[in-house]
Amino acid sequence: MLAIISPAKTLDWESAVPNFAFSQPHLTAYSEKLIKICRQLSPEQISSLMSISDKLAGLNAARFEQWQIEHNEQNSRAAIYAFKGDVYTGLEVETLSRDDIQFAQQHLRVLSGLYGVLRPLDLMQPYRLEMGTKLANEKGKDLYAFWGNIITDALQQAIEQQGDRILVNLASDEYYKSIKENQLEVKIIKPVFLDNKGGKYKVISFYAKKARGLMCRYIIQHRVTDIEQLKEFDLGGYQFNPSSSTQTEFVFKRDLTK
């Protein structure tokens, strides 16, 4: 079983990181091509392209300039400890054990606009390049065109190493679009998290993002390798709802307290 999640816009380069044997990202040759394109952009162009403030645009222009093909512990940080957002609040990686992280290294992947696919302990340098960015490149008008089959092929290879051919989609739609689903020889499960607010169950973005992180944590801590085990997920007050679920979409519901 392999789970996928999205990265976060906010980065954490301050918190302490455990002393692990970190790994190298596999697709940096492609990352370097994107960096070269981004270095040609002015801060004003970056601001317009990414819809971010002038201050953030300046910061990211500097990050593009400072990026190096060589990744080491001086200029990089393990991906799973580098992101800070709702999904990662649910994952709460800082409380996972060394054995948990080693399991995650085999069973979790972070999709990335710059790096394509990252394992939890893969080193990465600070960047901001969301998958939906319309960055023109030699292959087309955006990052979906740039990555083409590359991300799909990397995931297929990782899934085949698991032996069970199951992919758990905990990524956002923006990032999942980078995968060519019809080319994956796997069973894809998409957990959906619904909260009852005002008498109606619906997806509430903030809660759903955190729930994706909770599900990821559950998979890691319980060493989940079977589809039926996913249905036992109960963190955060969510419960599997069979009547709302299908064979590929697992619905989990929760009643919010007033």
From Swiss-Prot:
Superkingdom, taxonomy of origin: Bacteria
GO BP terms in the entry: response to hydroperoxide
Classification via InterPro entries: YaaA
Cellular component GO terms, alphabetical: cytosol
Pfam families hit by this protein: H2O2_YaaD
Spans traversing the lipid bilayer: none
Family membership: Belongs to the UPF0246 family.
Protein name: UPF0246 protein HSM_1789
